[in-house]
Amino acid sequence: MLPVVATTSTVHRGGHARFGVAACGALPSPVVTAFTLAAVLQKILIANRGEIAVRVIRAARELGIATVAVYSDLDRNALHVRLADEAFALGGQSAADSYLKTEAILDAIRQSGADAVHPGYGFFSENADFARAITEMGVAFIGPPPEAIEEMGDKVSSRRAAERGGAPIVPGTTEFARSADEIVAFGEDNGWPIAIKAAFGGGGRGMKVVQDAASVADAMASAQREAKNFFGRDEVYVERYLTWPRHVEVQLVGDQHGDIVWVSTRDCSAQRRHQKLIEEAPAPALPDGVEEAMGEAAVKAAKAVGYYNAGTVEFIFQDGDFFFLEMNTRLQVEHPVTEAITGIDLVEWQILVASGEPLPMTQEEVLATRRGHAIEVRINAEDPAGGKFLPSPGTITKLATPDGFGVRFDSGYESGDEVSQFYDNLVGKLIVWGKDRDTAIARTIARSRTPSSRVSPPRSPPTWRSCAIPTSPPSSTRRNGSRNASTCPAPLRRRPRPNPLPRVRPRPSRSSSAA
């Protein structure tokens, strides 16, 4: 039984139970770790916003740890600000003028007296200079050491680290590409197509697939421009491009005592524009022994750079072989599917590791917790018109979230909140667990029929945004009883029974878990 530390805040009471860790419904019970709060951090500042900030706040609250939010001018009334014990303004509207202002965040740390900082994902989560500045203040950084971030943040040096650890890598360069002729020579030696990639990038940005030698010069220049615009550096490298691989990643956690465990695999192959949309755990239909080999290779790659805290090693898998792709030195957006099949609270483990605690479980104990299958669907505020799926900022006039057995919904928004054009358009994540993959798929499809959101763009009539899941449009999209086919599919309707017997409808069940 964990001791409870009382806090003075009352904002945590209320109707937010469907979000975050406590919204897991009937997912596997969390693994409770025995420890004393005397050794744990006392106040955590979350240098982020949206659903990941809410996720960290809820995990910290379960440990009795006070939380501090930071916010831009646009996020003054955001959910993560409402939930935190304290909140400090960063000023500005865009990310560059707020959440990426190092000095403003460092000042908030000093004023709040926080003894730890959780970076979430995005923003400063993989910035070694930011992590170093935090630790030099005598404040715990809830993440890996700066040196590991530096080595794994550079795709070229991370390939070298993976080789040192014995992980197989895609044929490619372990140095920056200096000229188009060098890339052409690589393509001729290793075969086409090839991929030119930003050395300091990710998410598909700064990546160009080249089919032949004649296209190399233009593709290299384009990749360098894009890399410079998005990541501030234009170095690129080249590797063999696999035409139809699966994207399989390994979640791991290490402590500051040299122990690292891999928790599960995840399949993230369902992508759009090289960005993940649907993830599942464990990765299905891998040949015998491949998952274990991936896990062991991930641990070796992490140990090669002295890694600790949560991280993810990404592999590509094709024709029975897997290759190291990169390492994300942070918590992933899709981490809940791993939590769903293991019952392990990964954010809690992050906090414990940052406190200097050893890992609470051995590798064998971690693998023994796994059961069932989980799927995550990302819900984005987008306009599907014309198949473009462009970001659709505005006010969420209605947010109806799925619930039920094995269902969890993580979000940084509630009805009435604003989705800003200045930030990521991720509204939430639907996480569904089933006793096997078929059950998880069926349950995901069933829960995806819940209307997710209705967004009113600024200075425009209210319109329906499908958020990438099947929904029915509101009455405002209908004229003379007809449906506007360009918005959403028609809702499923049951035909009325002839002379139906009266039925007693059960009351909708309320979530019994406290957020």
Which residues make up each language-model segment?
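Intrinsic low-complexity, disordered N-terminal segments enriched in polar/charged/small residues
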Residues: 4-8
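Short hydrophobic alpha-helical segments enriched in small aliphatic residues
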Residues: 13-17, 25
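Residue-level recognition of short loop/turn positions
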Residues: 19, 257, 319, 436-439
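N-terminal beta-alpha lobe that positions the nucleotide/phosphoryl donor
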Residues: 32-313, 317-334
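Catalytic cores of soluble metabolic enzymes centered on carboxylation/carboxyl-transfer
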Residues: 298, 336-515
